[in-house]
Swiss-Prot record:
Lineage of origin: Bacteria, Bacillati, Actinomycetota, Actinomycetes, Mycobacteriales
GO cellular component, as recorded: DNA-directed RNA polymerase complex
UniProt-listed NCBIfam families: PRK00405.1 (NF001616), rpoB (TIGR02013)
Name under which the protein is recorded: DNA-directed RNA polymerase subunit beta 2
InterPro entries: DNA-dir_RNA_pol_bsu_ext_1_sf (IPR042107), DNA-dir_RNA_pol_bsu_external_1 (IPR019462), DNA-dir_RNA_pol_su2 (IPR015712), DNA-dir_RNAP_su2_dom (IPR007120), DNA-dir_RNAP_su2_hyb_sf (IPR037033), RNA_pol_bsu_bac (IPR010243), RNA_pol_bsu_CS (IPR007121), RNA_pol_bsu_protrusion (IPR007644)
Organism: Nocardia farcinica (strain IFM 10152)
Gene designation: rpoB2
């Protein structure tokens, strides 16, 4: 069937039959998966390959047998061509887009703030239709941003990701509603194009069929039919079966086509004089001209499918036809009449039913390629206007394609998209998983999509058609819930933009290994069994009745012979992050959602450690995320150093792989690569050569395996607080490196050029000790807040220099100039070690913004040990803040003296229903201790042979929905290997007797003990803690600024004032509202009194009161301030002089550019 072939086109590009050299993980999986997980970045890379029409994409398309598929750029140029002038005597057409080599490497672009782009050229052909002369030229169309291998773009030196957008597909949508007054069934239909006017038909409560063109006033539908050239007799013949159509025809007063056209014109263009020709042109332009109306291929496909027209023919034509309109009206009339099926014009029987707009058969993805293509289309249509104007103004003889074309609009449109579009986002590089998830994200927001405020509950809710396409778990908490999702593991996008998911074909009750990809609406026509349905060795179902999903309805038991398809994998319905949660099936969905989201917030630690309890997804996720170095050709490792790995391939070629060393990610985390192969080692193609951040031996490793006890401890772990052992601090178990980038530029000012120098006024040599002769801090220097990183001076002066003065300065040098210190200092609250410096200068021909002569970047790395107030989390949504760090000797310990690392409260489990964390703890202990199954117990009958025995420190995989069962856990806990003393610490129930580290007494009850995987999250207390004594004030209100970034104060708000009033603390309140806030004169006087040891003076009038007065006066209200005896008080401006005098005496700087530190403010 043609339709099925067209839909199932995209293939798995990276067929990874298993990654060579991968670490061993013992798996509890019982179900064999016939299909490998597809390339996880294909969503991005395939779409971009289609856009640029790369040779690899063409090869894959040819191999699939796709006919007439053109690349995205070609498609747009074909649409645009030819551009004709207003008389039609000249035309310009474009073809053959091609790219030259990219201008600079990815690393160079990142370093120099450039865009990773390739020059785009097209062939432009100018034809003079009068003389038949043809001029052809290759035209440069601007630099086109290229996608990196990792599915990202580098724009102005920063890595960005274009998120795929979920939108309603063009097509016809039938809807049902009930009239509130009469309680009658009403039906309506909308024909929604990709671009152009909407066409709506409806049946109202008076049983007449109406039409709305382009959302204007309603008219009888027969007016439109007559305007399209149908006579009353033809309408009666076609719709004679329908009473409501006949009654509509009777009520329609228009006589013939001309009258109908004029009637429509009056509704669409009220106030304009109607003529038959203009009305005819208007109607044709609205729906039947490709320039104005475009259903797109997908819209045409959806209409053909819904209405049953042109079935089995190729999808062609992107405008409406008269047949479409008539068939749509017939479908609506039959729907209203309650018919269940209808015979389409081609003789095909189609079901008559209303549409569900939230169904994934009606929602499609606009992937990267299409989003950029739409933007280019906008740019080209702007260019088209320019070309037309130039055709009419320029001399015909002198015209060449180059003189007609202005590429500025195209370049600007592309730049605008990558720089400012809601869908072009700053890449989340917190860890490899967060980057991978970001590239697989699906957003319903953005231009042409929904807005947060308008989106209702139905759009956000989980829909049955999401199964295997969009993850029901992973979505943000908060206003975007349900509007942003994540692509499921096995899902892929077909050329129409619909998401497909794979199924195994079932023939006569026998499951085959043939895999078919189905879209959501195709899937609804079949019966689908679950992946865990019991199947015998011959592929036949073991049970007569199988639990299946039929259509969009509930589950039901069906005879084995009726089953059409079966899921390929139990993890088919979830996304990558969700598939990395072990025992997901035992967690409540709300907590699983938090677990999936919090894995993306884990910071890379100094030493990564893969989880003891994984799900088998870790390896593929890490390799596809692209932060590990993967070998390209099989061969032997020739040389290994910290910076390079060189591989001599079997075909005699050499390849050196460069490691990234301590680079800063977009989120300020540290990205570092470390080789994991040795010299002389044999490596295969696809093998991991070096670990990146958060990976160990090529597996995703976001946190640490810690020995956990689940018990309350003196109330210190109340309300999700966590107690940690001092060992984790001392041994840097949870220590991470954070790198901050500080930037300063030297510009030309009106008073002269700024200068980067070591010669800074009023600064001691002590402060300059770490600066080199240029005035830039040396690499390796330890710096803390307030230290100078780059010395810079700016000319100071009230007036511009006269030409004479400038001449004298030029002759005698600039010694006499007044300069002020504008050095780059370490911001408040930060410290660390300088690890890198980049200097860009106009003298070295670096590309700098206008007016900038020199730019210096300083990278400061900070090692952050774990501390009270940091946030930790497990993978099951079990998060908490560190409440106390205990000395190791005070921690509870096991009978063999091993102290636990972390104590979690028992109260965090029952109400939240994330039991997965308990099972993970038990299985973690089993993996750490190792096991050996004795005899032939009943619980072990489903375990594979290799699972009956495992050494200590074994890593385990328990895939989602197909993992270790409860009885297997209990059995294995009883089969764990004893420790060196021959004792088993933990009982069959997973509990151990713990001893109190302080007293040595055992705790009264056994405690659940085991190994849990704990992540350190990005919410670190160092980034949040903040204090201020003196600092900047707002210019208008003269009150302190707010927030850590502005070095602001704490707002003493309305409710806090009430509290003071309640206590009757009048003087304290007055002080808070005046001299501690915005009584400008009072502030200085109080400071003076404190310095001189005098009594605190009376407060004055707060600045905000003066602002209020001025605002009221600006509304033309004559407001005066009266004293207690009724005399008007003049609020003098002269107070400023007293203020300046007092400030000068005390040496206080009252200018806007406050010094960066408290010490400087006080000096």
């Amino acid at each position: 069937m043609l339709e099925g072939r067209i839909l199932a086109v995209s293939t798995q590009t990276k067929a990874v039959a298993g990654i060579p050299g991968a670490p061993k993980r013992v798996s509890f999986a019982k179900i064999r998966e016939p299909l490998e997980v597809p390339g996880l970045l294909d969503l991005q890379t395939e779409s971009f390959a289609w856009l640029i029409g790369s040779p690899e994409w063409r090869e894959r398309a040819a191999a699939r047998g796709d006919v007439g598929l053109v690349g995205g750029l070609e498609e747009v140029l074909e649409e645009l061509s030819p551009i004709e002038d207003f008389s039609g005597s000249m035309s310009l057409s474009f073809s053959d887009p091609r790219f030259e080599e990219v201008k600079a490497s990815i690393d160079e672009c990142k370093e120099k703030d450039m865009t990773y782009a390739a020059p785009l050229f097209v062939t432009a052909e100018f034809i003079n239709n009068n003389t038949g002369e043809i001029k052809s030229q290759t035209v440069f169309m601007g630099d086109f941003p290229m996608m990196t291998d990792k599915g990202t773009f580098i724009i102005n030196g920063t890595e960005r990701v274009v998120v795929s957008q979920l939108v309603r597909s063009p097509g016809v949508y039938f809807d049902h509603s009930i009239d509130k007054g009469t309680e009658k069934d009403l039906h309506s239909v909308r024909v929604i194009p990709s671009r152009g006017a909407w066409l709506e038909f409806d049946v109202d409560k008076r049983d007449t069929v109406g039409v709305r063109i382009d959302r204007k006033r309603r008219q009888p539908v027969t007016v439109l039919l007559k305007a399209l050239g149908w006579t009353t007799e033809e309408i009666a013949e076609r719709f004679g079966f329908s009473e409501i159509m006949m009654s509509t025809l009777e009520k329609d007063n228009t006589a013939g086509q001309d009258e109908a056209l004029l009637d429509i014109y009056r509704k669409l263009r009220p106030g304009e004089p109607p003529t038959k020709e203009s009305a005819q042109t208007l109607l044709e332009n609205l729906f039947f001209k490709e320039k104005r109306y475009d259903l797109a291929r997908v819209g045409r496909y959806k209409i053909n499918k819904k209405l049953g027209i042109h079935v089995g023919e190729p999808v062609t034509g992107s405008v409406l036809t008269k047949e479409d309109i008539v068939t749509t009206i017939e479908y609506l009339v039959r729907l209203h009449a309650g018919d269940k099926t209808m015979t389409a014009p081609g003789g095909v029987e189609v079901p008559v039913e209303v549409d569900d707009i939230d169904h994934f058969g009606n929602r499609r993805l606009r992937t990267v390629g299409e989003l950029i293509q739409n933007q280019i289309r906008v740019g080209l249509s702007r260019m088209e206007r320019v070309v037309r104007e130039r055709m009419t103004t320029q001399d015909v003889e002198a015209i060449t394609p180059q003189t007609l074309i202005n590429i500025r609009p195209v370049v600007a449109a592309i730049k605008e998209f990558f720089g400012t579009s809601q869908l072009s986002q700053f890449m989340d590089q917190n860890n490899p998983l967060s980057g991978l998830t970001h590239k697989r994200r699906l957003s319903a927001l953005g231009p042409g999509g929904l807005s947060r405020e308008r989106a209702g509950l139905e759009v956000r809710d989980v829909h049955p058609s999401h199964y295997g396409r969009m993850c029901p778990i992973e979505t943000p908490e908060g206003p975007n819930i349900g509007l942003i999702g994540s692509l499921s593991v096995y899902a892929r996008v077909n050329p129409f933009g619909f998401i497909e998911t794979p199924y195994r074909k079932v023939v006569d009750g026998r499951v085959t290994d043939e895999v078919v990809y189905l879209t959501a609406d195709e899937e609804d026509r079949h019966v689908r069994a679950q992946a865990n349905s019991p199947v015998g060795p011959d592929g036949r179902f073991l049970e007569d009745r199988v639990l299946c999903r039929r259509g969009n309805e509930e589950m039901e038991y069906v005879a084995a012979t009726e089953v059409d398809f079966m899921d390929v994998s139990p993890r088919q319905m979830v996304s990558v992050a969700t598939a990395m949660i072990p025992f997901l099936e035992h967690d409540d969905a709300n907590r699983a959602l938090m677990g999936a989201n919090m894995q993306r917030q884990a910071v890379p630690l100094i030493r990564s450690e893969a989880p003891i309890v994984g799900t088998g997804m870790e390896l593929r996720a890490a390799v596809d995320a692209g932060d590990v170095v993967v070998n390209e050709k099989a061969g032997v490792v020739e040389e290994v150093s910290a910076d390079y790995v060189t591989v001599m391939a079997d075909d005699g070629t050499r390849k050196s792989y460069r490691m990234r060393k301590f680079n800063r990610s977009n989120q300020g985390t540290c990205s570092n690569q470390r080789p994991i192969v040795d010299e002389g080692q044999r490596v295969e193609a696809g093998q991991v050569l070096a670990d990146g951040p958060c990976t160990e031996n090529g597996e995703m490793a976001l946190g640490k395996n810690l020995l956990v006890a689940i018990m309350p401890w003196e109330g210190h772990n109340y309300e999700d607080a966590i107690i940690l052992s001092q060992r984790l601090v001392e041994q840097d178990v949870l220590t991470s490196i954070h790198i901050e980038e500080h930037e300063i530029d030297a510009r030309d000012t009106k008073l002269g050029a700024e200068e980067i120098t070591r010669d800074i006024p009023n600064v001691s040599d002590e402060v300059l000790a770490d600066l080199d002769e240029r005035g830039i801090v040396r690499i390796g220097a330890e710096v803390r807040d307030g230290d100078i990183l780059v010395g810079k001076v700016t000319p100071k002066g009230e007036t511009e220099l006269t030409p004479e003065e400038r001449l004298l300065r030029a002759i005698f040098g600039e010694k006499a100039r007044e300069v002020r210190d504008t050095s780059l200092k370490v911001p408040h609250g930060e410290s660390g070690k300088v690890i890198g410096i980049r200097v860009f200068s106009r003298e070295d021909d670096d590309d700098l913004p206008p007016g900038v002569n020199e730019l210096v970047r300083v990278y400061v790395a900070q090692k952050r040990k774990i501390q009270d107030g940091d946030k930790l989390a497990g993978r099951h949504g079990n998060k908490g803040v560190i409440g106390k760090i205990l000395p190791t000797e005070d921690m509870p310990f096991l009978p063999d003296g091993t102290p636990v690392d972390i104590i979690l409260n028992t109260h965090g489990v029952p109400r939240r229903m994330n039991i997965g964390q308990i099972l993970e703890t038990h299985l973690g202990w089993i993996g750490k201790a190792g096991w050996k199954v004795e005899g032939n117990p009943e619980w072990a009958k489903d375990l594979p042979e290799e699972m009956w025995e495992a050494p200590a420190d074994s890593n385990i995989a328990t895939p989602v929905f197909d993992g270790a069962r409860e009885e297997e856990l209990t059995g294995l806990l009883g089969s764990t290997l004893p420790n060196r003393d021959g004792e088993r610490m933990v009982d069959d129930n997973g509990k151990a007797v713990l001893f109190d580290g302080r007293s040595g007494e055992p705790f009264p009850y056994p405690v659940a003990v085991g190994y849990m995987y704990i992540l350190k999250l990005h919410h670190l207390v160092d980034d949040k803690i903040h204090a201020r004594s003196t600092g900047p004030y707002s210019m208008i209100t003269q009150q302190p600024l707010g927030g850590k970034a502005q070095f602001g104060g704490q707002r003493f708000g309305e409710m806090e004032c009430w509290a003071m009033q309640a206590y009757g603390a009048a003087y304290t309140l007055q002080e808070l509202l005046t001299i501690k806030s915005d009584d400008v004169v009072g502030r200085v006087k109080v400071y003076e009194a404190i310095v001189k040891g005098e009594n605190i003076p009376e407060p004055g009038i707060p600045e905000s009161f003066k602002v209020l007065l001025k605002e009221l006066q600006s509304l033309c209200l004559n407001v005066e301030v009266l004293s207690s005896d009724g005399a008007a008080i003049e609020l003098r401006e002269g107070e400023d002089e007293d203020l300046e005098r007092a400030a000068a005496n005390l040496g206080i700087n009252l200018s806007r550019n406050e010094a960066a530190t408290v010490d400087d403010l006080a000096n």
